[in-house]
Design a protein with these regions (language model features):
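Hydrophobic/aromatic residues within transmembrane alpha-helices
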Residues: 27, 36, 86, 98, ...
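Hydrophobic transmembrane alpha-helices of multi-pass small-molecule transport proteins
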Residues: 48, 108-111, 121-138, 264-281
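Hydrophobic/small/kink-forming positions within alpha-helical transmembrane segments
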Residues: 18, 22, 49, 73-78, ...
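Membrane-interface interhelical linkers
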Residues: 1-19, 24-34, 39-71, 80-90, ...
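Alpha-helical transmembrane segments of compact multi-pass small-molecule transporters, enriched
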Residues: 43-47, 98-112, 186-190, 222-225, ...
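Helix-coil boundary and interhelical linker segments in multi-pass alpha-helical membrane proteins
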Residues: 1-6, 53-64, 109-122, 169-176, ...
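Selected transmembrane alpha-helices and immediately adjacent juxtamembrane segments
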Residues: 3, 147-181, 213
């Protein structure tokens, strides 16, 4: 039973994140990266608060934990800005698989900070994903600045990987419901103040709001489903299934957005996805 539950929750997370990234592309094309970030994250924030009200879990924080929560929130903000800005200038079918490579960062941090040992398949996964990053960066007649979207995606991958590494510690130090909600409260505050500092106008056409709301619901839905899955089943099982969400995105982008990518970039995407599977085993 736990295995079947893990498969179900892993699939829900995979579908949620895959469709979320697809809709994000359409939202950014219409509302811009910053407004998409604000309204989509605000939606997920509201959903997480409702979830916390239904399943309340409190914890007494220390100064050290508060500092870690603030660092995590800053990294999440950085990750989203880089991710969404990358989508503005590059195909989502290239950006999303790169960002999904964040497990590499988690494992590297685990090695250097927690002194965890690499397995053979993890080393192979590193090589595959680095090769994939090189391949998706290849463009015919590339000009200076042409790879800005790829650089943004790599920045997002590093930020999200570091944030999730810290989040893993915070879950163990508190509990996953409190860590999820409190982290989102801090991130929402940072997003609001950052956009206020940048003097970003938040007004958007009403026709765009359904896209922004759907992104937020799918993103938080995937996060909650993943968290449930790893609590009732094998972490490796849920991680492998959910990590394949770029497959959904790439298929949708190819069918509906008609994104054009080179054969080298296609091979790079496949190599990154293969590395994702290996690194999650």
């Amino acid at each position: 039973m736990p295995l079947s539950q893990g498969i179900i929750f892993g699939l829900i997370a995979m579908l949620s994140w895959g469709f979320s990234d697809f809709i994000v592309k359409m939202a950014i094309d219409r509302a811009g990266a910053y407004r998409t970030l604000f309204y989509s994250y605000l939606t997920g924030f509201i959903v997480s608060i409702i979830f916390f009200i239904i399943f309340p879990q409190f914890f007494r924080l220390t100064a050290f934990l508060v500092i870690l929560f603030l660092i995590e929130a800053f990294l999440v903000l950085l990750g989203y800005i880089a991710f969404y800005r990358g989508i503005e200038v590059e195909n989502i079918s290239i950006v999303s698989p790169i960002v999904a490579g964040y497990p590499v960062v988690i494992i590297l941090l685990s090695y250097f900070i927690l002194r965890e040992v690499f397995t053979l398949h993890q080393i192979i996964a590193f090589i595959l994903m680095i090769l994939g990053l090189v391949l998706v960066s290849i463009k015919k007649k590339a000009k200076i600045g042409d790879n800005k979207g790829v650089y943004m995606a790599i920045t997002a991958m590093l930020a999200f990987g570091s944030a999730i590494f810290i989040f893993g510690y915070l879950i163990k130090a508190t509990n996953w419901i409190f860590a999820l909600v409190f982290g989102r409260i801090l991130t929402m505050l940072l997003i609001f103040n950052y956009l206020k500092f940048r003097k970003i106008q938040l007004k958007v056409p009403k026709s765009i709001l359904p896209f922004l709301i759907m992104v937020g619901i799918l993103e938080i839905g995937g996060a909650i489903s993943y968290s449930f899955g790893v609590n009732v089943s094998l972490v490796s099982l849920v991680s492998v299934i959910s990590s394949l969400y770029p497959l959904i995105l790439v298929m949708l982008a190819g069918i509906f957005l008609k994104e054009r990518i080179s054969n080298a970039q296609k091979l790079g995407i496949f190599t990154i996805l293969l590395g994702l599977v290996l690194i999650s085993l």
